[in-house]
Amino acid sequence: MKVRLGVDMMGGDHDPLVVWEALEEVLLSLDGQPVEFSVFATPDVHQQLTHSPLSRSVQMIASESFVSMEDSVLAAVRKKRSSMALGLDSLQRGELDGFISAGNTAALVTLARAKIPMIPAVPRPALLVSVPTLSGFAVILDVGATVAVNPEEMVGFARMGLAYRQSLSSSDQSFTLGLLNIGSEERKGTDSHKHTFRMLRDVFGSAFLGNVESGDVFSGKVDIVVTDGFTGNVFLKTAEGLFDFLRHILGDHLEKTIKTRFDYTIYPGSIISGLSRLVIKCHGKSRETALFGGISGAVDLARSNVCGRIAAKFGLEEA
């Protein structure tokens, strides 16, 4: 099937040409696969791209502005013709199968939620990301969409994480869940954590393995880790920073197999789960390698209709 993806060139921490270089690598790697890209950027950036021979392979859509990292959500909403807004508008109209941005997270989540319908019965969106573990990978959500959530919404996150893992599995594999906390004992955490613990145990039974500490996430003990957006974002950025620190300190002494296995940049960016259409948020600091992973990962997720499969799984679970 043909996949149509939109890429927001603007708003990240690096020059838009870094995004373009990653997209060029993706275009070269597709080897004739039916994928169409629409690139959203200001006219001056489009002008710079015309020098690339691959620029003829994409549709270029000019925006009047872009959402910066410093923009408030209100300022972003007011920019009706920003690259982010135009891309989400195209997704809303069904002209795209997915949209990718490394821009302002709060703005992207807010605009996406305003323009793209939520999956029925999903109360709040959550940023879902895959992290490498000793046994493969785990998904963790939320990592930044919603700072404060209640226990009922955390259960909703768990349902989405489970539906996501099931949608990527071709078998009837069972998956385990854990609640990110400051200790493994049931009594640990705030009153909200304790309430969430009881609800997860009641809803998921033996699939819920209880509380997990940050270090346990990488052990592969659980397949889905549930947390609020504040804690999840701190966890994710700490993990990314530690890997970058080790890569910088050890350099060539870090075995290639270890680099490949535990390099977070090879995974797609964060999926705004709960939306009926695919929106992927790449880290604002993403360089070419991470952006390549985000864009190529988006191709695979769009081709597999991951949002539709999550909605179907969610519907079956709720029925």
UniProtKB/Swiss-Prot annotation:
InterPro entries given in the database record: FA_synthesis (IPR003664), Phospholipid_synth_PlsX-like (IPR012281)
Pathway: Lipid metabolism; phospholipid metabolism
Family assignment from sequence similarity: Belongs to the PlsX family.
Swiss-Prot/TrEMBL keywords: Cytoplasm, Lipid biosynthesis, Lipid metabolism, Phospholipid biosynthesis, Phospholipid metabolism, Transferase
Compartment(s) where it occurs, according to its Swiss-Prot or TrEMBL record: Cytoplasm
Record flagged with keyword Transferase: yes
Organism of origin: Chlamydia muridarum (strain MoPn / Nigg)
Name recorded for this polypeptide: Phosphate acyltransferase
Predominant place of localization: cytoplasm
Catalytic activity: a fatty acyl-[ACP] + phosphate = an acyl phosphate + holo-[ACP]
GO biological process, one term: phospholipid biosynthetic process
GO molecular function, a single term: phosphate:acyl-[acyl carrier protein] acyltransferase activity
